[in-house]
Amino acid sequence: MSIIPLLHLARELDHDYRTDWGHLLEDDFGFGVHAHDLFHPRRLLLPNTLGLGRRRYSPYERSHGHHNQMSRRASGGPNALLPAVGKDGFQVCMDVSQFKPNELTVKVVDNTVVVEGKHEEREDGHGMIQRHFVRKYTLPKGFDPNEVVSTVSSDGVLTLKAPPPPSKEQAKSERIVQIQQTGPAHLSVKAPAPEAGDGKAENGSGEKMETSK
């Protein structure tokens, strides 16, 4: 009897064991989602032929080297996923598929956007679990905190956006004043009325002085 089928079986069992535990520990809710990931949806993984259970579902397939990126993001390394800032303004996306919309809050404190997600203890495939995260994003200089908007998609991606600040040309207050055509100027322009009781003589006016005899 060949031992090759047994080797394949052992490899599959080891892979499923590592995968299930990896997904259990890889509860990466609240982390950023790269724009590239949004265009590569993950297929729902059905139970394999061995009947060893269903892997944890996440709506997006992570890009190559995701586990290394996760560790760098958690440590705040140089390759951490940062908000995108460009000509279209400020934008950041994050995976919140583990939370319902009413379990999320977004608020602005000064020029910082604070995102919080929390749900009470509930049962999942591994037991009881309670999730809570808080993420903060500082708006770049010039961005108006009052312009921040947030959306959450049906597949669990929260997006924060803020329009770009106005350019220097747009910041200047400019208004075109319409020129109206009128009749003779003396009919439309009023002469300024002199102020009463100011006690001052106007230019060219005479002043009579009385002397005592």
UniProtKB/Swiss-Prot annotation:
This is Heat shock protein 27. InterPro entries: A-crystallin/Hsp20_dom, Alpha-crystallin/sHSP_animal, HSP20-like_chaperone. Residues 197-213 have a biased composition (Basic and acidic residues). Belongs to the small heat shock protein (HSP20) family. GO terms for molecular function: unfolded protein binding. Pfam families: HSP20. One of its GO terms (biological process) is chaperone-mediated protein folding. It comes from Drosophila melanogaster (Fruit fly).
